[in-house]
């Protein structure tokens, strides 16, 4: 794997456990600041479903040999610099940082075929520049009814847009007609962002 990465070391990235949406926003911000020419090739990807019960494997918070966990949603960063090259940067995975798209999807999501329909994963893919402008969260989802924190928040102020105080739900929602970006099933997601070497060879003939 080439070493020309947007984020050479995971230690260089802003990270707070259980705030994946903000961690990815910070990655987008870092690209805009240090590699602005690459921003149009970057995406924030939300994973969820109607019941907000999505199984993911190879996660640091997972259990057992397969490191599986069920989240209400998850967010990762994706860099798609060319049709045959797509890298996933997930700050919560036990896979390498980054990981090639096909390996990441295969090991993290496996297949929907063995899962009940209520556990099928859907993906909202949002261009990084759009995410930087439209994402806004006052972190209310991380507070208990008494106002205490479920998990300690980042030390920096909440990320707030100019037009909205808290729109996280619009990003987690997997209804195609609501929220920014495009929504895909697992198979559609793979079809749109993975081109096998065999297909690329055929197209180049």
Curated annotation (Swiss-Prot):
<protein>
    <recommendedName>
        <fullName>Protein N-terminal glutamine amidohydrolase</fullName>
        <ecNumber>3.5.1.122</ecNumber>
    </recommendedName>
</protein>
<dbReference type="GO" id="GO:0005829">
    <property type="term" value="C:cytosol"/>
</dbReference>
<dbReference type="InterPro" id="IPR037132">
    <property type="entry name" value="N_Gln_amidohydro_ab_roll_sf"/>
</dbReference>
<dbReference type="InterPro" id="IPR039733">
    <property type="entry name" value="NTAQ1"/>
</dbReference>
<feature type="active site">
    <location>
        <position position="90"/>
    </location>
</feature>
<feature type="active site">
    <location>
        <position position="20"/>
    </location>
</feature>
<comment type="similarity">
    <text>Belongs to the NTAQ1 family.</text>
</comment>
<comment type="function">
    <text>Mediates the side-chain deamidation of N-terminal glutamine residues to glutamate, an important step in N-end rule pathway of protein degradation. Conversion of the resulting N-terminal glutamine to glutamate renders the protein susceptible to arginylation, polyubiquitination and degradation as specified by the N-end rule. Does not act on substrates with internal or C-terminal glutamine and does not act on non-glutamine residues in any position.</text>
</comment>
<comment type="subunit">
    <text>Monomer.</text>
</comment>
<dbReference type="Pfam" id="PF09764">
    <property type="entry name" value="Nt_Gln_amidase"/>
</dbReference>
<keyword id="KW-0378">Hydrolase</keyword>
<dbReference type="InterPro" id="IPR023128">
    <property type="entry name" value="Prot_N_Gln_amidohydro_ab_roll"/>
</dbReference>
<dbReference type="GO" id="GO:0005634">
    <property type="term" value="C:nucleus"/>
</dbReference>
<dbReference type="GO" id="GO:0070773">
    <property type="term" value="F:protein-N-terminal glutamine amidohydrolase activity"/>
</dbReference>
<dbReference type="GO" id="GO:0008418">
    <property type="term" value="F:protein-N-terminal asparagine amidohydrolase activity"/>
</dbReference>
<feature type="active site">
    <location>
        <position position="74"/>
    </location>
</feature>
